[in-house]
A protein has these predicted regions:
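Amphipathic alpha-helical "coupling" segments that flank catalytic cores
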Residues: 1-681
């Protein structure tokens, strides 16, 4: 027989950003627990709101699976004497296994004890397993509540634990399990009875609790969409805000509010940021994408007195927007260039000078990158824009608007630059320098934006590393991993020919780190290599292929290209032989220095054929052609060479020439991958 398990943990309101992870961890821990205890089940799912995390296990067996174990003991000669009687060793082994010596099995010269363990009743096991499950949930900022010697993110108020219709009894954190849950704080604050897992969602809904997050999400989206339509527009529903609101409410009701049209004269982000990031309101936009003087918010409750709720939200937003208007007006009393002077009083990082000095470095670094991107053919306008964008890049950090709303850094710089009459390219680059701001964010799209963003990120990485503040473990206070990943993704998307070593060299020069240049190159390359590894993993690249191509990361944008090529090579016919040929070359060549190859010293036609095959492959690579056919031909030439030629010729000049030929081929192959890292079946 099978029954369903319902386990609800009732708490004070848990922070919205924690709930998705809590529910995911709860499901994974439950699955692991059930498997470890030999409890078969059909399905595990979790449901939750800010005040409750619920686990439902359908089709949970009523007993553990029986298990038969067979344990090998001493040899027969040691376990029994010549008359077949158990010795002390044999009797001791049998006693340890809980069996009679006569039950020992003799096989292959050893004795074995076969033990049958009957499964325990699930209802009995759950009394200890459920408390253990709660204790195992990994939570940030867990703490003790009251005088209890128990830690959780918020105080636990109740447990519902039902196996079928039977209560699973236990006490944890001073709370005893039962079948009573609690309804919505204001709409149905009384306790209510849950009879079974099948009854759970319906019982919750009667108490104004929409416990299924996906159903609650659909309700929120539908209500927001309909409410925005009534306002004459479309709501801007961002995934992050929707996820946060989802775990702020148990019974969602969307409502609209409005604000004075005069605030629409502010830059759109200056209105949206206090609305969305500070008040958790959804902006409403017209069909042309312009902002409307309306917003949508989601109430944790019903439809009663919505006008009062809307008025309260409008009052709060009005104060926020009035602040934004004030800061904007004050900021506009100076140009962005004038604001920049104040950067002299702002510390970049301890030991790295001021933000003003940082912009001086960025001016040189961005200009150098623009010249590199243009292959030394950048025109005067491009170079002037590069200097100007870098010069003004951090000026908005000292404005009132960004001081109050830090999320607007770069965005207000762009807006103020446009109002000051700066070129659109300069203004957009000021915004794009911070991209990507978060995982999945868009990357810089303009050449100047790419240059300034790359300059800013490499300056941050090299500067912070120079002070010994390299991220370790989970500690990354300056967000260098995110910035390095952003740099990698940006260079890959742009198919940039920029070399990482050139960026580091220029940054070291500007920081006056010449004596630490070589160490810095190694540190930064290793740091970028890990970010590239993450990128390749997300793209599904095999581990050994990652290892093969990550030896050289100087040309960042080329790494995924090389990985894709190696995977295609490994999928081709005869790939095992080809890889073995390349590895064979490396086994010999990597221990030698190499020199110039002199065809006049060739004694066998296979030497010339190998050189010719190498040149064809090298030419194909230089021309950007498909090199796979040429490298397959090179592999065959390598095999023929080794079959016919003795590399270690008695003539030292011939031997060195052959080693130089192999060294040249291996060096060229290493530019694509180290094939010795490839694991062949």
């Amino acid at each position: 027989m099978k029954r369903d398990l319902l386990f609800e943990i009732g708490t004070e309101e848990i922070p919205a950003h924690v709930m998705p992870h809590l529910l995911e961890d709860l499901a994974q821990l439950a699955e692991t627990m059930l498997k470890e205890h030999r409890l078969s089940y059909e399905k595990v799912r979790t449901l939750g709101t800010p005040r409750r995390a619920a686990l439902i296990v359908t089709g949970l067996a009523e007993r553990q699976e029986d298990v038969n174990t067979e344990t090998r003991g001493p040899s027969v000669a040691i376990a029994f004497d010549a008359d077949g009687n158990p010795t002390k060793a044999g009797a001791g082994f049998a006693r340890g296994q809980g069996v009679d010596p006569s039950a020992l099995i003799q096989r292959d010269g050893y004795v074995y004890a076969s033990v049958h363990e009957s499964g325990a009743a699930t209802a009995e096991l759950l009394t200890s397993l459920l408390p253990d499950l709660v204790r195992a949930i990994p939570l940030p900022n867990s703490m003790r509540w009251g005088d209890l010697d128990f830690r959780f993110i918020r105080p636990i108020r109740w447990f519902v634990a039902l196996y079928g219709t039977e209560i699973v009894p236990f006490t944890l954190a001073g709370v005893t399990s039962g079948n009573h849950s609690r309804g919505h704080r204001t709409l149905a604050p009384a306790d209510f009875v849950i009879t079974s897992a099948a009854d759970y969602e319906a019982a919750c809904e009667k108490a104004y609790i929409i416990v299924d997050p996906e159903r609650r999400r659909a309700m929120i989206c539908e209500q927001i969409t309909e409410t925005a339509k009534a306002c004459g527009g479309t709501a801007e529903i961002t995934p992050d805000l929707l996820e946060e609101v989802l775990y702020l409410v148990e019974y969602p009701t969307a409502l609209s509010g409005s604000f004075e049209e005069k605030y629409l004269a502010l830059p759109a982000e200056a209105v949206i940021t206090p609305m969305r990031d500070h008040q958790r309101y959804f902006p409403v936009k017209a069909a042309d994408g312009s902002l409307l003087p309306a917003f949508i918010t989601v109430r944790n409750g019903g439809k009663a007195h919505l006008d009062v709720v809307a008025h309260g939200n409008e009052r709060v937003l009005r104060a926020r927007l009035a602040d934004a208007q004030f800061f904007f007006d004050e900021d506009r009393k100076k140009s962005l260039a004038e604001h920049r002077e104040k950067l002299k009083t702002v510390v970049f990082q301890r030991g790295l000078g001021s933000m003003y000095e940082k912009t001086e470095r960025l001016m040189a670094l961005t200009t150098a990158i623009v010249e590199e991107m243009a292959a030394g053919d950048a025109d005067g306008t491009a170079l002037a824009d590069a200097r100007r964008a870098a010069e003004l890049s951090k000026a908005d950090l000292v404005t009132g608007m960004v001081t109050e709303f830090t999320e607007l850094q770069g965005i207000m710089g762009r807006e103020y630059a446009l109002l000051d009459g700066e070129s659109p390219a300069v203004a957009r680059a000021i915004d794009e320098q911070y991209m990507p701001r978060f995982a999945g964010d868009e990357l810089p799209q303009t050449p100047l934006g790419v240059a300034l963003s790359a300059a800013d990120k490499i300056d941050n990485i090299v500067g912070t590393f120079s002070q010994g503040r390299i991220p370790t473990g989970s500690q990354d206070p300056f967000g260098l991993r995110r910035q390095a990943l952003g740099l990698v993704l940006m260079l890959i998307e742009q198919e940039s020919t920029m070399l990482l070593s050139d960026l580091v060299d220029e940054a070291c020069h500007l920081y006056d780190l010449e004596e630490f240049r070589d160490k810095m190159q190694v540190y930064v390359a290793d740091f970028i290599r890990l970010r590239l590894k993450n990128v390749l993993s997300e793209r599904g690249v095999r581990y050994e292929v990652q290892e093969a191509v990550l030896g050289g990361v100087d040309l960042v944008a080329d790494v995924p290209v090389r990985a894709a090529y190696v995977e295609r090579l490994l999928a081709s016919e005869g790939c095992e032989a080809l890889v073995q040929s390349f590895v064979r070359v490396g086994n010999i060549a990597r221990s030698v220095t190499g020199g110039t190859v002199d065809p006049a010293l060739f004694k066998a036609e296979e030497e010339g054929a190998l050189l010719s095959a190498y040149q064809v492959a090298a030419d194909a690579r230089a021309e950007g052609e498909d090199t796979l056919p040429a490298e397959q031909a090179l592999g065959r030439a390598i095999d023929t060479f080794f079959d016919a030629v003795m590399v270690m010729d008695k003539d030292a000049r011939v031997k060195e020439n052959r080693l130089s030929l192999l060294k040249m081929i291996d060096d060229d192959l290493l530019e694509t991958a180290d094939y010795s890292k490839i694991v062949l079946n």
